[in-house]
Amino acid sequence: MLNRVAQSWRGASAHIRSLASKKFPTSAESRPAVSADIGSVTAPRLAIAHDYLTQRGGAERVVLALHRAFPEAPIYTTLYTPEGTFPEFENATIITSPLNRVGLLRRYHRLALPLLPLTASCLKVPAHVAVVSTTGWAHGFKFTGEKLVYCHSPARWLYLRDQYLGDEKKNSVIGVGLRVIDPLLRFWDQRAAARSEHYVANSTAIQERISRVYGKDVPIIFPPYSGGATRVEEPVAGLQEFTAAGDYFLLVSRLMSYKNVDEAIKACNRAGKKLLIIGHGPEKDKLLKLSGPNVRIISGISDEQLCSAYRHCLALLAVSHEDFGITPLEAGASGKPVIAYRAGGYLDTIREGLNGMFIEQPTSEQIEAAIRKFNPEEWDKQAIKNYIARFSEERFIDEIRQAVDELTASSSSGA
């Protein structure tokens, strides 16, 4: 494996340097994406940029919302894996870096970390205005015009490295590599942030982190949830018997060590409560071994199937520290409350007693106590739906368009 990684890094570096000024045709792996420098492409009025499109998460849902807000805007990104992210991206024009030609790095984007400063710096975005969705890389792309940076978080692998890697991977190849190149990454990241005048945070927690890390005072635009109130639901094949009674708790998360999925499993095992986990990630095998007969773990489902899982659950468990955390809003669209960790973005989206209840620490003991105490009859479904409507995609699109209009007007006036 290490030899494959080393070969991929060497090969990718050569690709980036030798191909950065060339244009490639649409690739089969990332249809209709184009892998190349974009020097010959006519500059659009507006473009969208994002770190990489290789997974299904809240940041990727924000990019989908940006695509719906600006459907003609091309999306620039370092890596794109169609089968790994949301299928709706297949309808977008996606332009990738030369790094996308290395299959191993598309599948395991963390292996690309040492190459991403160079890759990002070489990825030209020739647009008059760019809306940049970033967790640490896209704000360093090579922009030719104005940019509005929508920040999900300053780079976690720099400023929250232990959380990003998890205890078991601190001394892994990637963990050691990050420590070695930390000064280079910090220099690159701080310089990229300094070149970006117009920042927006996605939550109060990120607003505070941007102030601490970059010294910027920025406004907030809350991200949207994927509305489920009017969506047609589709049962998940093979789970009808498990979910039919509507007596299960739901957890929707990437299966990473810092997400505390193991604590939720232990809590439900002890309490004898059903738990449906939707997500994928490197911790899956470990979590399967930990799970009792009351737990199911699934992944790769459609939005309609996700909607069905939300509608028929007792409540959502949201027990990791999230910078914003969209899942409580997705649950709320179906009138479902949340048992959440009192931290981070959940403080923006959960009003205690209305659409959720808090635990003080994400331990199995506190999760167990909360699910034993939980009574579904105490929650008003319609009140929950009314509350989370303020986080709708329509509201997000209106606020983003207004921010872009203000940026364009400011640029035109020379202010």
Describe these PLM feature segments.
Residues 166-199, 207-208:
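Membrane-proximal helix-turn-helix segments that form the acceptor-binding/catalytic region
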Residues 311-323, 336:
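Acidic donor-binding loop of glycosyltransferase active sites
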Residues 362-365, 375-407:
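A charged, aromatic-enriched C-terminal amphipathic alpha-helix characteristic of glycosyltransferases
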Residues 69-137:
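Active-site donor-binding segments of glycosyltransferases and PAPS-dependent sulfotransferases
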Residues 225, 240-259, 265-276:
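Conserved donor-binding/catalytic core segment of Leloir-type glycosyltransferases
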Residues 285-308:
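Nucleotide-activated donor-binding/catalytic signature segment of Leloir-type glycosyltransferases, i.e.
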Residues 318, 337-342, 350:
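Short hydrophobic beta-strand element within catalytic cores of glycosyltransferases
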Residues 299-300, 352-353, 357-364, 371-378:
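Conserved acidic donor-binding segment of nucleotide-sugar-dependent glycosyltransferases
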